[in-house]
Amino acid sequence: MLKCHPGFNTKLELLKYGIQFVYFIVGLGFHFAVIKVLHKKWSVYSKYPFLKLYYVDSILSVLIILLDLVLIRVFNYIPPLCQWVLQEFPEPSQLISILFIEQYLQFVKSLIFCFMVVNRANNVICVKSFGTIQSCIIPHVIVFCILCPLLGVWTAFLSDSRFVPFQGGFIHETMMEYHWITVSQFSVIISSITIVTVCICSVISMLCISRTHAENKHTEQSLTASALAMSIFYVFALSMNIYCQKAHASSLEMLEFWKALTAFAFDIILVCPPVIMLCLNVRLRINVFSVDTRPTSPK
């Protein structure tokens, strides 16, 4: 039977979890505030395809954060649970594979952001009428982003998985019973596609942001600035993910260190986007932090 790593200080591991708990709760507060405003004034904000996609992205972030708070990070950072769980699940089980829902949601979130930056690039280089076309295809884009990641995770869901020690706790690992691309390999593919798309579209947006074709130029420029700011964090987090998946760590401790650092990098793109949106979009910020019932545009 697998054994938990000895030597991890319970108080220190609980402190690590506590720090993550705090910034996740803060992030949830911002997400719920923005989602509430977007939903309440949907007739106004739904005119912007970017905000439709951001609405979905924010919901995905909430789901991932809740999953991390309740299960994933609890398993990772609370040593007393390690031995008990390894005793309860001494053998691989398909029940454990349910935890791969986190990776699936991360893949969906990355693809959604790809289309968010594509929207911004289209906005600065295409004619005004293209916005109507974008609004029509957004539902199809969302369906595509939801279904596409299943190509990389269906094997994990259908295969048995097991718990393996990780720092003071443990993580889940699939036994991979099918001859297909692994979750790690698919993660590298999705991350690479996202990084390339984000970099290309961000360069286009930066070069052409002053030539935005829209009636509400200030609104469109603020949304583009928000996408550019988020892009920095996405490129950083996904680059870390690729390095962690492809690099060969010299020791188990280094492997665990890079996995923990990669998880923290992804935490940034879970928590920061609503803060960025509120900082760079005046009308959205006003609607969130004050009583404002007028149907105005999200500057």
From Swiss-Prot:
Its localization reads: Membrane
| Listed GO biological process terms | sensory perception of chemical stimulus
Q: Which GO terms describe its molecular function?
A: transmembrane signaling receptor activity
Q: Which UniProt keywords apply?
A: Membrane, Transmembrane, Transmembrane helix
- Give the UniProt entry's GO cellular component terms: membrane
Organism, scientific name: Caenorhabditis elegans
What's the protein name?
A: Serpentine receptor class gamma-30
PANTHER family, per the entry: SERPENTINE RECEPTOR CLASS GAMMA-30, SERPENTINE RECEPTOR CLASS GAMMA-RELATED
Which parts pass through the membrane? 18-38, 59-79, 98-118, 137-157, 189-209, 223-243, 260-280
Topology with regard to the membrane? Answer: Multi-pass membrane protein
Q: Which family does the entry's similarity section mention?
A: Belongs to the nematode receptor-like protein srg family.
